[in-house]
Amino acid sequence: AREETLIIIPGLPLSLGATDTMNDVAIVKEGWLHKRGEYIKTWRPRYFLLKNDGTFIGYKERPQDVDQRESPLNNFSVAQCQLMKTERPRPNTFIIRCLQWTTVIERTFHVETPEEREEWATAIQTVADGLKRQEEETMDFRSGSPSDNSGAEEMEVSLAKPKHRVTMNEFEYLKLLGKGTFGKVILVKEKATGRYYAMKILKKEVIVAKDEVAHTLTENRVLQNSRHPFLTALKYSFQTHDRLCFVMEYANGGELFFHLSRERVFSEDRARFYGAEIVSALDYLHSEKNVVYRDLKLENLMLDKDGHIKITDFGLCKEGIKDGATMKTFCGTPEYLAPEVLEDNDYGRAVDWWGLGVVMYEMMCGRLPFYNQDHEKLFELILMEEIRFPRTLGPEAKSLLSGLLKKDPTQRLGGGSEDAKEIMQHRFFANIVWQDVYEKKLSPPFKPQVTSETDTRYFDEEFTAQMITITPPDQDDSMECVDSERRPHFPQFSYSASGTA
């Protein structure tokens, strides 16, 4: 059966549901839904409340009083999402799909009857319309119109407009870094500067299905306005007639995974340096952007030419095999999953501190805290097994890792309202001056042996050995940037981090 798109709306990121900060937040609809697990793809009954602020929260049991409402298992927002109806993998299914940063995230639900599904769809649409009106009333004044031939969005004052429209022809395509359901990530070289970037290419149809028109690309704006020394910056974003393209920094000091593999284990001091930079970046995402990163793992950490951390945003939603009996029960990187993610208790910021615990354990112990080739056994270890440490590890490091790898997110270090501040105050980081971390005043413990931003010695040899072709043979699918009147869905999707290339 075809998916049917109902609505696309701007608003909050999916990752952090809005909370009851005002007394006039009302419940619009409540009832039982079956929610499909995000990783272990079984269906679980959940009692959901939809509120007029966009909050969509689920419980194992129907909450009887206000106290019980304070700790939902699932907590996210229906804002800025597509809502789709489908009859697969079960009848009366609906899917909420959202672009968080540049990664497409989905949640899947089903109900017993078409009428029930229609009721939920109508309720969600009602909430969406209210949020849309609110946003329109409070939205910053923007000059320029969708038909503006420059194709450039009015930027915040701090950002210069691009002097020319960026197109796909300005890059050499070197290596496929990742592929998934919604698109691909390619290592590219900008012809004019010789600099390397990661280009994430998303198929437009998965973000705007059928003839729905996107009100705005809020997440694109979030990315543009994110400025943090240890987060991958967005250099350009542009579109072709069927794709959205995000061009992001690709740090050339090599993946941390590469350096750790070579050295097997890092000293506690070196791990402390990298850990501090990661904490600084996650603190910014949580407190300034209200975003949970969700995907912290060694492969997503790179070093820049000076040896500072860069957290990447090259993630793609992994593809399942098939619906039905042959469907793999799991997709993603299982070794890094927090217990609450495995149990499908939709997670908050504490999931990032679990991820920090796993990567810092790898750095200081030279192996993963939990590992088994058999996924079922691995899940059991993550959920049940106590953490073990090598005898050589110092007491402060043990204390930090024990706190970060607590199974219960509410008991986890950083799991309380203080979030990152709790980790910053831990005795393992006692000598760290956090403002100095942010300002890159700490000297990196290892400096990559690269001479410039175009030095490729830490790249896989095959990265630079040959160019890859990404233009499909079909003329209709040309990768040329097309005129604004031919792309009504994303009339203002164009961005450059500076006026020059």
From Swiss-Prot:
- How the protein assembles, per its UniProt entry? Interacts with mouse THEM4.
EC number(s) per entry: 2.7.11.1
Upper classification of the source organism reads: Viruses, Riboviria, Pararnavirae, Artverviricota, Revtraviricetes
User: A biological process (GO) annotation for this entry?
Assistant: response to growth hormone
Something else known: This protein is synthesized as a Gag-Akt polyprotein.
A Gene Ontology molecular function term of the record: ATP binding
Instruction: Please state every residue range assigned to the domain named Protein kinase.
Output: 171-429
User: Where is each PH domain found?
Assistant: 26-129
The known PTMs are summarized as:
Autophosphorylated on threonine and serine residues.
**What is the similarity comment for this entry?**
Belongs to the protein kinase superfamily. AGC Ser/Thr protein kinase family. RAC subfamily.
User: Which positions fall inside the AGC-kinase C-terminal domain?
Assistant: 430-501
Q: Which Pfam families match?
A: PH (PF00169), Pkinase (PF00069), Pkinase_C (PF00433)
Indicate where the modification Phosphotyrosine is found in the sequence. 347
- The UniProt entry annotates the active site at 295 (proton acceptor)
- Name of the featured protein: AKT kinase-transforming protein
Q: Which of UniProt's keywords are assigned here? A: ATP-binding, Host-virus interaction, Kinase, Nucleotide-binding, Oncogene, Phosphoprotein, Serine/threonine-protein kinase, Transferase
Outline the segment boundaries, as ranges, of region: Disordered: 135-158, 471-501
Gene3D superfamilies to which the protein is assigned, alphabetical: Phosphorylase Kinase, domain 1, Pleckstrin-homology domain (PH domain)/Phosphotyrosine-binding domain (PTB), Transferase(Phosphotransferase) domain 1
Q: Which reaction does it catalyse?
A: L-seryl-[protein] + ATP = O-phospho-L-seryl-[protein] + ADP + H(+); L-threonyl-[protein] + ATP = O-phospho-L-threonyl-[protein] + ADP + H(+)
